[in-house]
Amino acid sequence: MSSLVINSKIWGEMFGTREMSDIFSDKKTIQYYLDVEAALARVQSRLGIIPKTCGLEISKVAKTDWIDWELLEKRTSIVGYPILPLVEQLSLKVKKNLGQYCHWGATTQDIMDTADVLQIRDALSILLSDLVGIKKALKKLVKKYINTPMSGRTHLQHALPTSFGYKCSTWLSGCLLYTSDAADEKYR
């Protein structure tokens, strides 16, 4: 049984979508690490830092379908992080004795931080897409309820009357602000 609510079969869907959970799953996280290792090798090959064929050979096998997950889990618990055990497996998978060039010149933190950024980028795309839908729904609510009275609230008590449409417009303004900022961040 999971000790985390986000991994719970009962509660998990209440706190996140399957799409978002997939981005941060173990399998996808390892794939991000492999993607970074492959990209690093391709660039280093192109620059002549490692043999020219290494980038392609490492990229060919940078997939999670061959990973020995039990070994990765066991070695990670010993080492304290998954990069060394992953690179050990990756270097054995690369043909033509080119495995020695896996992870060339990189640190564990380089790989993990870069993969984290890629995960966050992909998660941000989902959030922005969701916010577009929320904005559309809020715009409809603003128009529909612009003249529907309700009690205003301040300091956890009733205040001057307002409209539900106006209340929705304040939520909408927040969404507009955040989507603008998030879209700007996405392309920086």
Residue ranges and their predicted role:
Residues 178-188:
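Single conserved hydrophobic/aromatic residue that forms the stacking wall/gate
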Residues 2-180:
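A helix-coil-helix interface module used to build multimeric assemblies
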